[in-house]
Amino acid sequence: MLKLLLGDPNARKLKKYQPYITEINLLEEDIKVLSDEDLKGKTAEFKQRLAKGETLDDILPEAFAVVREAGRRVLGLRHFDVQMLGGVILHSGQIAEMKTGEGKTLVATLPSYLNALTGKGVHVITVNDYLARRDAEWMGQVHRFLGLSVGLIQSSMTPSERQKNYECDITYVTNSEVGFDYLRDNMATSMADVVQRPFNYCVIDEVDSILVDEARTPLIISGQVERPTEKYVQAAEIALTLQKDEHYEVDEKARNVLLTDEGFAQAEELLGVTDLFDPEDPWAHFVFNAIKAKELFLKDVNYIVRNGEVVIVDEFTGRVLPGRRWSDGLHQAIEAKEHVDIQPETQTLATITYQNLFLLYPKLGGMTGTAKTEEAEFERIYKLEVTIIPTNRIRRREDLSDLVFKKEIGKWQAIARECAEMHELGRPVLVGTTSVEKSEYLSQLLREQGIPHELLNARPENVEREAEIVAQAGRRGAVTIATNMAGRGTDIILGGNSEYMARLKLREYFMPRIVRPDDEDVFGVQRAAGLPTGHGAGQGFVPGKKVKTWKASPEIFPTQLSKEAEQLLKEAVDFAVREYGDRSLPELEAEDKVAVAAEKAPTNDPVIQKLRDAYKRIKQEYEEFTSTEHDEVVSRGGLHVIGTERHESRRIDNQLRGRAGRQGDPGSTRFFLSLEDNLLRIFGGDRVAGLMEAFNVEDDMPIESGMLTRSLEGAQRKVETYYYDIRKQVFEYDEVMNNQRRAIYAERRRVLEGQDLKEQVIKYAEKTMDEIVDYYINVDLPSEEWELDKLVDKVKEFVYLLSDMQASQLEDMGVSEIKAFLHEQVRIAYDLKEAQIDQIQPGLMRQAERFFILQRIDTLWREHLQQMDALRESVGLRGYGQKDPLIEYKSEGYELFLDMMVNIRRDVVYSLFMFQPQPQPVVQTSSEMV
């Protein structure tokens, strides 16, 4: 009712931006007639206008019109009005909700171009290396055409490559890389090692996945700590003998375990110890982790074992996360459970959450298909508004009502039947599953029924073919099973993706003849000259595969190439070999040539022109088939998406649904659920158990009930609230750390940039002297009773060069005079020390100052992080004593921080006065942290 009276706030907001769109459209004709050179010249013109005092908003309409025209010329894509609207919203620092297939990637070019004109740099953030690389190659062409530099950060890059890429006007990078680089920069020991510029503006693609789903996971850089591996092995054996419910209880919701009294007794007896918590020989931590590993972390669901290593599977995207490890000894406990080599445990050196990382940007915008469900969170934590952008074409997707089964087995059989029916009809099907294990179970059922299908999950052999499988998922009768398709980045095009197939065919012929043999490393991420890039589309890692063939599965191509097309392709590749040399390019550079050949950007390279002609011809031949098939699939109802379990968040369910019915295509979705699904079991509780009894139906008969659907949605809302509270708590606690982190990193940066740190060290020394005076002199006592001899001894402890000082020198002075006298003495002593040191090597004292300050900051900050962790755990228990844990954490954390700052000062003063370099060798100015 209120909406009717006040109007929809979203519509009001869109209306406010409408004049921009009108103005951009009016400029379109004028800009269309410009030559390529004149269009490129606009960039310099805009920069001059900004220098003369115009604002970004003043030049927005013309800048957006220029990007639209550049996109049309280079990519053959013209931004629709709704995409322009999305661009304006991103530029104004909001979140734009745009449905799947509405061209979010193209929208990002608008605000990133406009904000890059300031010269301060723009980051376009994606969820994985493959997408960052794809966007930098694809959308980067628009920016390069307009004269801006485009950078790309990939996980395998060296610091100097990172530095070069962050210097670019627009840098494509994943959220984790930008976070780890920020932390590493704040551990650098010289400015030359710092890779990032100060943050300015970023556009986050799939913003909900990064700012909401990943917000519970802090980024951590860690160093190794030695811990006895046999303790993990013993604890794993004990966990096997302990019985659930008798010796321990499992809290699935909080993902925690609690030992019962019997459990403690049993574990202590088996280990032959009297107390699991004995500080001299602690066992509790190992035993708890071993039980968690047994009960809460399941193989092929939470992790897979590959090449003798435990590799985490991301619960949101279903991708493997090689190199990431669970902390606090949990990963080691799982390694012990799986009988693989146990890697050393780690200690946190630096950490930040994504929430606080992205709050460091003065302005940020984000895009996603599903943000409205988390609108409150975006506004509370990030102060970001969500604006829904209308779709360009009317949506024709049909969301069918859920089918709920009593038993899980009945549900899977029904899904297999539905796949078979759709396959018969010739409709493509996409099934989203929540784990590797479930996807393989369904695959087995379909194999038994003889239904051809593709499987896409975290297993390495499937990862490699990811883009290839997705390109096929829209073909007639195709059945694709995928673990969490969230944010997969490759669109499912009905009838098949002819562009991608043509690109694969080009790679198949070109790569084996051009790639340098030594460069074919198993992971396909060798460093290369030229454009710094990472994983090629559809590349991955296949253990034991030493020689790459680049051959795609033959059934991926819709038809045999004509003789003419094949001839054209062979000639283009022969010409490339003549020009570049046989097997002469690094793999990534070769991937790059294929990528550019498959685009429309102007090029002067004759090899790319020839490859492009061949590519166009192949694409045209494939298109004849795919376009007929497209019409056929559309007439049969389009893509059918099956969800096999409700996710923790309605948003991820909506992302899965959003794969169907893109850009006005028809499509349908349906969720198949069972009363044994995790969500219902953990959060639906007893009500559902009661319902199960009430429904006296067969296992494979679907139940449709309003009460059940409401129960389901209630459970999902409960989960969302539960996780929102966790994220809010993570945020509130990290907020305390964040203020401390900013202070310490700012101090560190001052030291890194400071040319002359002598004054800073002297300030430290003076402050230390003041603290000694305040400690030993009680102003309430008469001066005869002051402990001047102890005071002088303490001063000499810090500054041995003042060994001649006597307490009698201070006898007739007041407190402020003593302080002034000590300040003077400490300065003289420091000059003396400097003269001694610089005799050994001129300028050595300056290097020593920087080294000691950084080393103390790093070492004490590292210890402080551990103290704060311990404090956080202990304040949690105070909640029982009617005290607010957060307030306790804030006040005690602040005390710890002040203590640390004092200790840094004192340690630096002490270390510098005690510093006795040996003649000859130069002091190494690198801290122990790196």
Curated annotation (Swiss-Prot):
Encoding gene (name): secA
Residues the record lists as binding ATP: 83, 101-105, 491
Keywords from the named record: ATP-binding, Cell inner membrane, Cell membrane, Cytoplasm, Membrane, Nucleotide-binding, Protein transport, Thylakoid, Translocase, Translocation, Transport
Catalytic activity: ATP + H2O + cellular proteinSide 1 = ADP + phosphate + cellular proteinSide 2
BP-aspect Gene Ontology terms: intracellular protein transmembrane transport; protein import; protein targeting; protein transport by the Sec complex
InterPro entries: Helicase_ATP-bd (IPR014001), P-loop_NTPase (IPR027417), SecA (IPR000185), SecA_CS (IPR020937), SecA_DEAD (IPR011115), SecA_motor_DEAD (IPR014018), SecA_preprotein_X-link_dom (IPR011130), SecA_SF2_C (IPR044722)
NCBIfam families named in the record: secA
Organism: Trichormus variabilis (strain ATCC 29413 / PCC 7937) (Anabaena variabilis)
SMART domains to which the protein is assigned, alphabetical: SecA_DEAD (SM00957), SecA_PP_bind (SM00958)
Protein name, entry field: Protein translocase subunit SecA
Documented EC number(s): 7.4.2.8
Family of this protein: Belongs to the SecA family.
Self-association state and partner proteins as the record states: Monomer and homodimer. Part of the essential Sec protein translocation apparatus which comprises SecA, SecYEG and auxiliary proteins SecDF. Other proteins may also be involved.
An annotated GO cellular component: plasma membrane-derived thylakoid membrane
Cysteine disulfide partners in this protein: none
